[in-house]
Amino acid sequence: MSSHHNDKATFLERLIFNNRPAVIVICLLVSIFLFWQATLIRPSTSFEKMIPLKHPFIEKMMEHRNDLANLGNTVRISVEAKDGDIFSKEYMETLRQINDEVFYISGVDRSGLKSLWSPSVRWTEVTEEGFAGGEVIPQSYNGSPQSLDQLRNNVLKSGQVGRLVANDFKSSIVDIPLLESYPDPQDQGKLLALDYRKFSHELEDKIRDKFEAQNPNVKIHIVGFAKKVGDLIDGLVMVVMFFGIAFVITLILLLWFTNCLRSTVAVLSTTLVAVIWQLGLMHFFGFGLDPYSMLVPFLIFAIGISHGVQKINGIALQSSEADNALTAARRTFRQLFLPGMIAILADAVGFITLLIIDIGVIRELAIGASIGVAVIVFTNLILLPVAISYVGISKRAIAKSKKDAHREHPFWRLLSKFASAKVAPVSILLALVAFGGGLWYSQNLKIGDLDQGAPELRPDSRYNKDNNFIISNYSTSSDVLVVMVKTKAEGCSRYEAMAPIDQLMWKMQNTEGVQSAISLVTVSKQMIKGMNEGNLKWETLSRNPDVLNNSIARADGLYNNNCSLAPVLVFLNDHKAETLDRAVHAVQDLSLIHISEPTRRRG
């Protein structure tokens, strides 16, 4: 190296290249440690991480979480009879076995488990002697034709058609509320967090696979947040496979671009080191892989390859004038380290801004991406030039790089004319027109999901097919808007509170995109009608406090312990942005009209 270049060498350059063996050894030791850490990282997420906890609606949900125990994280299993309907001995036996099997799966809130076999699912009717009722499946059920006829009558009188039983009577649902944490079977004093991947696999192995094989006339459909997240985590295997494909494609393209196997291997190796460091540091700092952060390694790989190619190209150009690979690597480091550092810092700032989004998985994605671009500084801006200073670049690659540097490509020559003095004003005008057009068209941009089901999964995925089945055959979907009507203690049964709830339900049931709505008013009207010999004229709210109090006695789960909160369950066709906007605006518009001191509506 000439004295001219020695004079330009910075302290950082001298520190790195005068201690190349130490740099290699340190990076090797760090890589071994972080590789071990990376092997320990596991898929991990939770219900709370997937939602914006500071959103006013979510804050109210968390505030009344104990009052809404069965309205949060739930899974629904629909058991379909392929031939015939549910009123057969074989089907009901399979449903009973599924109900029992689900009961013992870890993480299930067993007190809230509901199906036709649950004692809490009852029927009621009005007779000459008064009210009659009982369990939908009585203790005397034995699978005989007479028992099945009685079961059919009980289902029709239970009000569960469209809820637990499909509208066409060809399937029924097992409703499974989940616990975010549950006692360890081995140590009851210790709480275990719900493992979504394990839970999803148990549903597949113990429910779907087992009972579809046991009864060929049965088909299982499973929906719910936990199942969706489990399917997303299972996609990690596919992600790893695609990462391998991307690696091979990148290898081929780099070989074609550089004509040098040594430099190609160096770029790929240092970039893989960056990915390993990123995963290792994520585990070291206590993070896991969720359905979003599992995509960060792709991003780090792409950024690392981009910076690596710039380094290799620069070293190849310098190698045509330098005495050896070390000199070329030092000159390239001197020229490209600062621009590369600025580019990486810009990337990091962009990812850090995602931290303002108050959703756990998005924040972890931002942290993971920021860690990833930070390690690229060490692996691709420092380690790569040091590695190339040892292995060098082939003469073919140097000759090709020199030739490409002096060759004018027709396309780039044409493109450069847009920056000439004559054409530049036109270029600016076109850019302004494109900006204005984009700004105008962006007003039509939809916020939220545009399709039914889980947009994170393919439209033809098993989960989305199951979701479509339930939407098509039931009046209650997995997309539920819960409107919390809050009153003073023991006030939810007052006419002043129930009348606005009744109006809210009517408004929601006549809103596009709403399947149905249920509240304590639904039960109250049915009971008042029943107490008046089943006369439909009496299916309305009474102003008599004693009548209202008695009418909600069986409205289990539709008001809290001190009757200060009454949820209205609004079942939606889907969770598209338009559907949610219409439903929320309908609630808010009615709240502005009817809000009063004893009653408050909270989304």
Task: Name each region found by the language model.
Residues 25, 284, 301-313, 337-356, ...:
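Transmembrane alpha-helices and their membrane-interface boundaries in multi-pass membrane transporters
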Residues 2-45, 386, 400-451, 465-468:
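Signature of alpha-helical transmembrane segments and their immediate interfacial
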Residues 263-311:
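Hydrophobic transmembrane alpha-helices and their membrane-interface caps
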Residues 93, 141-261, 272, 499, ...:
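Extracytoplasmic
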Residues 46-108, 498:
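Juxtamembrane extramembrane loops of integral membrane proteins
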Residues 318-345:
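Helix-loop junctions and hydrophobic alpha-helical segments within the transmembrane domains
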Residues 418, 422-542:
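Juxtamembrane segments of multi-pass membrane proteins
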Residues 27-34, 246-254, 270, 274, ...:
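Alpha-helical transmembrane segments of integral membrane proteins
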